[in-house]
Structure formats: C-alpha cells, structure tokens
C-alpha cells in the first residue's frame, strides 16, 4: 500500500476519532519531542525512508533522549552509547520490560521467551539459558555441532566448483541446522523439502518484518489490521512455522524417554510433566511453541544475515580477507578444522567479525523495551509500561567510540599492540537483562563458520570491489543486505 494512501486513511481515521479521543495525553514528565496530532501522533515527522531515519533526524533537534508518538502511544527513544548504557545497564531492572512489535504481536501475544514479561519471562529465560548451556553433557557440545555443520558446508561449497552462486540459502541452512539440532535433536539435509520450506518462511518473514509497510503498520496497528498488507502474510507464515513446531512436539511426546532427553523439546516436556499440578506454571504448550519460534528468530536469521553481510564486505575489501587468511594459516594451518579455542589467538580475525557486526547493524533499534515502573531518567519521569526504543544503530555508529563510524575498519577493535580491545559502543546483541538469548551460540557460529570457509576457500566477485553496493535491501526492524553473487574457489 502506497505511503500517501496510508497517510490519507490514517488522517481520515484521525478526524473521525478526534471527538472521542482528543490529543494524546502524556503522563509523568516525558522527555521532549515533537508535538503529536490527535490519533496521527507524529506521523508527519516520520521520514518516508523509515523509523530509523526519522529517529536519527529527530535526535538532531531533541538530543539523545526524546519522545515520539507512534499513533496515540508515546515511545521514549534512546540514542547514543551513553544513554543506552545508562538505561539498559545502570537501570537494568527498570528497563527490562518487553514491548511489542505490532506485525508479530498477533502470533506471540506476550508468550515465548522473547516477548514475555514478568515471571513468565524470568522462568522461560532461566530455563532456556540453562538448557542450551547444559545440553550436550555426555553428548556432543554445541561447538562440535557447529564444526560438523561447517564440514557439511565445505563439502557443499566444493560441489559448486567455483561457479557463481547466491549464498543466502546455504547460510540460512547452516545456522538453522544448529538450532534444529538443539531444539529438534536433528539436522536436515540441505535439499530436504520440509527444511527448504521452513527456511523460505523465515527469510520471507524477516524481510517482511523489516519492510517499510511493516514500519507504517507499527504506527497504526489497530486501524491498518483491517486492510490487506504485509502483516497478514507474516501472520500466515508464522502460523505455518508454528504448525510444524507443534507436529514435532507431538512426535517428541510420543517417543519421549524421561531417562534420556534428546533435545530442548524433550527437556521442556519433562518440565511440563513435573509442573502439571501447578496451575500457575509457565511451562505449558503455548509457551513451548512460541519459545521454540523465538529461538529460531534469535539464532538463525540474524546469524545467517550477518554471515552474508560479512562475505559481501570481504569481497569489497580483499586486503582484509587476505590478512584474515594469513592469520588462519599461522594459527590453525590447513590440516585441522578451526576450534573455539583458536579465537583468543586470532585478534585480527575476531576484530573483523566484530566490525562486520557493527557495520552490519542488523537490528537497528533493537526489540522494544518497556519500563517496569515509574522511572526517573536524566531528569525525566517515564511512566510504568511506556515503550522504550534503544536505537542500537546510534551506538554502533557513535563517533565518540568509533573513529570512522561509517567505514569498515577492524581497527576499531584493536589496540596499539594489535590485541583485541573492548569497545563500549559495541552492542549488536543489545545490553542488560534483555541481551539476546542466543548471543553465545551466535558468536561461536560466526567465528567457526567464517574461519572454516576462509580456511578452505578463496572468494571472488563478478564485479570489481569498488562497484560492490553495501546498501541494505530492507531497513526496518532489521537490515537485510542485498543479494549478490560470489565464487568459492577451493584453496
């Protein structure tokens, strides 16, 4: 639906509802921001290129902490490393609530580990972290699963014999297979039709969630839900994924051996059985389905997209690729696969991966937070349950922490001696109590997949480096890199 038509519909709705609702009323002492119109909120201040561009422009006028109205609801926007850290770290508990993303809220409805709040969130997060951390005791570790998947990937890339290919599907396959092995207890063949359908649904959904129309939907979900749009396709996609998860749960239930849990679903089912007499338990079927869906979103699409962007950067900056491969040769050699222990001995490669994540800026304003109580912050009072958008992009491009914020520069993460250094502006997984559940697995995957590929292959592009375009194809909730062609040439 065209922006102008959406604007007209929203404006007409505003006129109709004005008599009933009047101007949005602020409570507490919210940070400054543009004056909202009835129902429309700050629509007229929104940039046609999306919410991120809008927020960054408003920051120039109102500073690092300001309020915008998305429709009739106030949202406090945090920009810059310092403001985000003050909120999510220094006042972690107060800012630990989870807000909604309008296009997926009809599916999650506050269930599952990502969008839950209160005791439900605490119980599911504790369980999920413990299960993923402890899973594999006496079996294969997560690192071994990733190494196995990396070997399968190398075999698949060798089959291409240096032909041009789009790496999107393969990179989705490898990251999805890691979560599948943890959640379902199995990996899929790359040509499995059920697996390919799942991958298509996830990729399509992430792209749609990141689209401009989904950002407009965020402004007026109660009104626009009655019209055709991407929100309906997202709902259908996620429902189909949930059906697959539900079928897998039933298969697990039928073959469950309490003395030998095979995977995340088995462990969850055992917890459900243990708590069945407790009516207040959060371990029920709905939370199982939506927590598994959450794990896929947290651990597959984001990591695969980071890898895709990483290799696009390696094509554009071949001198960086050469230096990474030199470090691989010095530390690992060619006769054994990379291991996680190698990372501490490879500061340049680690810095490159950090810089890929920083410049890739995959989730520009994170997943929305809410404050769990009336909260004093920088002289303002943010009322309980107010939504908060931490603009992670503004930290990842913060010139106070990154010397050349808009340029690919691994030196951002290296000290004068060439050792890896911590940078306060680096927060691609967010911060605080809501830091990404899959951070540990994602960091392990990025290192092992990245180094295994460059250990075994040289890469080449059909276009010269200077002509490679890094502009995201979609830029909303997520930044989706453009599709591109690449050759993997066996070394």
Curated annotation (Swiss-Prot):
Keywords noted in UniProt = Endoplasmic reticulum, Heme, Iron, Membrane, Metal-binding, Microsome, Monooxygenase, Oxidoreductase, Phosphoprotein
Indicate where this protein is primarily found: endoplasmic reticulum
Entry protein name: Cytochrome P450 2B4
Source organism, top-level taxon? Eukaryota
Q: What GO molecular functions are on record for this protein?
A: arachidonate epoxygenase activity; heme binding; iron ion binding; oxidoreductase activity, acting on paired donors, with incorporation or reduction of molecular oxygen, reduced flavin or flavoprotein as one donor, and incorporation of one atom of oxygen
Question: Which lineage do the record's taxonomy fields give for this organism?
Answer: Eukaryota, Metazoa, Chordata, Craniata, Vertebrata
Which biological processes are named by the entry's GO terms? epoxygenase P450 pathway; xenobiotic metabolic process
Q: Which InterPro entries match?
A: Cyt_P450, Cyt_P450_CS, Cyt_P450_E_grp-I, Cyt_P450_E_grp-I_CYP2B-like, Cyt_P450_sf, Cytochrome_P450_fam2
């Amino acid at each position: 639906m065209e922006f102008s038509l959406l604007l007209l519909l929203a404006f007409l709705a505003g006129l109709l509802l004005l008599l009933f609702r009047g101007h949005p009323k602020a409570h507490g002492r919210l940070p400054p921001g543009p004056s909202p119109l009835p129902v429309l909120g700050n629509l007229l201040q929104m940039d046609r290129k999306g919410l991120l561009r809008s927020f960054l422009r408003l920051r120039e006028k109102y500073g690092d902490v300001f309020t915008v109205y998305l429709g009739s609801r106030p949202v406090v926007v945090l920009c810059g490393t310092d403001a985000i850290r003050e909120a999510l770290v220094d006042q972690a508990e107060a800012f630990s609530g989870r807000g909604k993303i309008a296009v997926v809220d009809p599916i999650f409805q506050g269930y599952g580990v990502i969008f839950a709040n209160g005791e439900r969130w605490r119980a599911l997060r504790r369980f999920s972290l413990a299960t993923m951390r402890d899973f594999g005791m006496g079996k294969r570790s997560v690192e071994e699963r990733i190494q196995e998947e990396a070997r399968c990937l190398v075999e698949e890339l060798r089959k291409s014999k240096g032909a041009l290919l789009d790496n999107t599907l393969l990179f989705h396959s490898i990251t999805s297979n890691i979560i599948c092995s943890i959640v379902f207890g199995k990996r899929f063949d790359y040509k499995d039709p059920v697996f390919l359908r799942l991958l298509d649904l996830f990729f399509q959904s992430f792209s749609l969630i990141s689209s401009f129309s989904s950002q407009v939907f965020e402004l007026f979900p109660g009104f626009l839900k009655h019209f055709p749009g991407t929100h309906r396709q997202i709902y259908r996609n996620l429902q189909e994924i949930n059906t697959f998860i539900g079928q897998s749960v039933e298969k697990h239930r039928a073959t469950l051996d309490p003395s030998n849990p095979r995977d995340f679903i088995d462990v969850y089912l055992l917890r459900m059985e243990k708590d069945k007499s407790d009516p207040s338990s959060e371990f029920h079927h709905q939370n199982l389905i939506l927590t598994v869906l959450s794990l896929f979103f947290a651990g597959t699409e984001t990591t695969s997209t980071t890898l895709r962007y990483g290799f696009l950067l390696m094509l554009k900056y071949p001198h960086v690729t050469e230096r990474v491969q030199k470090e691989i040769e010095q530390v690992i050699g060619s006769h054994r696969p990379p291991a996680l222990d190698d990372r501490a001995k490879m500061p340049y490669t680690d810095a490159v991966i950090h810089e890929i994540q920083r410049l890739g800026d995959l989730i520009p304003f994170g997943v929305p937070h809410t404050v769990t109580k009336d909260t004093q912050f920088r002289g303002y009072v943010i009322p309980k349950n107010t939504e908060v958008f931490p603009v992670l992009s503004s930290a990842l491009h913060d010139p106070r922490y990154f010397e050349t914020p808009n340029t690919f520069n691994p030196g951002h993460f290296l000290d004068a001696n060439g050792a890896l250094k911590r940078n306060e502006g680096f927060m691609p997984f967010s911060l605080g109590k809501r830091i990404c559940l899959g951070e540990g697995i994602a960091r392990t995957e990025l290192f092992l997949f990245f180094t295994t590929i460059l250990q075994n292959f040289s890469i080449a592009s059909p276009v010269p480096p200077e002509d490679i375009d890094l502009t995201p194809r979609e830029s909303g909730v997520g930044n989706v890199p453009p599709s591109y062609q690449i050759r993997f040439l066996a070394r």
